[in-house]
Amino acid sequence: MEDGRSTFKVIIIGAGVTGLTLAHCLAKACIDYVLLDKGIVAPSFGTTITLQPHGCRILHQLGCLDAVLASCDVMSGAQCRDPSGKTFASNDFFRVVKKFTGYDTRTLDRKVFLRTMYEQLPDQSRVHERARVEEIIEDNEKTRVVLQDGQEFVGNLVIGTDGVHSKVREIMWDNANTAKPGMITVEEKRAMVTQYNAIVMACSPVPGLGSHDMEVTSNDKFSFLLLCQPDWISIIVHNKLPEDQQCTWPTRRRYTESDMEALVSRILECPITETVVFGELWKRRLKAQMISLEEGVLEHWFFGRIVLAGDAIHKVTPNSALGGNTAMEDAVTVANTLHTLLAAHPNKKPSTVELQDAFRDNYQNARMDRVRAIVKVGGDLTRQQAYDGWKRYLIQRWLTPIVGLDTLAKNIAGLCVTAPKLSYIDFEEKRGMLNWQDTVAADKELEMHHENVGGVRAEYHKSKWLLTSADWSGGFEAVFPQILGVLMVMWSSVWLFHLAFSRHCISGFGGEVWRTFGADNETSCVAK
């Protein structure tokens, strides 16, 4: 009899972070696949990818981690700075995250990461470059992908990992609205919004900047994010767009060198730290480009025999460094879903209905809440770090140092340890003070099995210091808002008292608010 896994074929479209990770996952599951990309593997555009601990765990499981780590160094501390470059919060951020998860946080050139993932594939002949998709035709249990040059690929499932401007998504939308008119609404098509753009660049090292640190420098409606490595620095300048320049799909902003230079000219003199201004980074730039920052989550992640993953269905702003890692989570969950479905019926290929049921329950519905929370975390961080409104200014400038970056690091760790891994590969994962949620669940299931077999009741105890991921399953939202709420009430009471009894209310805390947002602002740089 034929093995369903060996005869079922997946066509992956898009050889970015999601597509290459998925290719590795399918190879480990012995599921046949091809990977198509309209361009080349590892293009030069883009700057970096930051691998959070859960991304590193996935790479560890796939056997790619050592090769990736050979091309990058660890991250260590973090500093938050005001418009003058002065520090108002700092800690060993990434060391704290590692303490709770067991894995480092790494940042490396995106091109190097993609090239490494490609070279680690067991069969590179499955990857086809310059394969631009023209049409996807579903015919009973098969799908045909037709390229612009007339070449065709036939499989049983298409997975679109072709990014935020996905061609596969547009085809899926058309198929869905043809079969079920009104299924994909205008609201969903416009769910990804662009309110910020960014300059993404890399430069050579600058004296005065740490070689393993993250620097966040806030300004009025823009911010600088630096990820420093010994040989280079990754920089992202997040810039709030005027309302008349904000947009949704299908508008796609394309920026020229002149557009980028215009923004640079307004921020050239802005401090990054107390000893470095942005102009010094710009002079040392190795590459730079200006891009739109889309953000949002779509409702429908599949239809028929087409499934979407990664930026094609959700997009997060880069401040949280969760976008690529969330895409890798998608790849893992898609592979787990397929592996489970094919293993349950090893002698036949699943029907379209069976595929849709599996991806609805085990992929779309299972991940929707988590992905929405991640996108919200990224958006909130972008706006807080850019002082986008007085409430966000208060959170970033005044509540962050009170709450402490250790709390933020712990919550990032909590978000990491609730991420998925492949269900069909055993490996010795690293562990920290927080246990990985899926590992804890598997251990408990095994223990319950032993109970049933041996009639022995196991008692589970949580160490005061060894917390399970359930304690942090809400990520940022588990602790941060409650603390902020209490602090806001406390601060409001003090501020009202100050207003009522002081004739010099614009001083101290209030003075900084006035200086940051006032018309006579002389200390902060403003990009309009």
Swiss-Prot record:
Belongs to the paxM FAD-dependent monooxygenase family. It is found in: Membrane. It holds the Pfam family FAD_binding_3. PANTHER family: FAD-BINDING DOMAIN-CONTAINING PROTEIN-RELATED (PTHR47356:SF2), FAD-DEPENDENT MONOOXYGENASE ASQG-RELATED (PTHR47356). The lineage of its organism: Eukaryota, Fungi, Dikarya, Ascomycota, Pezizomycotina. Its EC number is 1.-.-.-. SUPFAM superfamilies: FAD/NAD(P)-binding domain (SSF51905). One of its GO terms (cellular component) is membrane. Its main location: membrane. It comes from the Eukaryota. The keyword DNA damage does not apply. Disruption phenotype: Impairs the production of depudecin and accumulates an epoxide-containing metabolite of slightly higher retention factor than native depudecin. Glycans are attached at N521. Its cofactor is FAD. This is FAD-dependent monooxygenase DEP2.
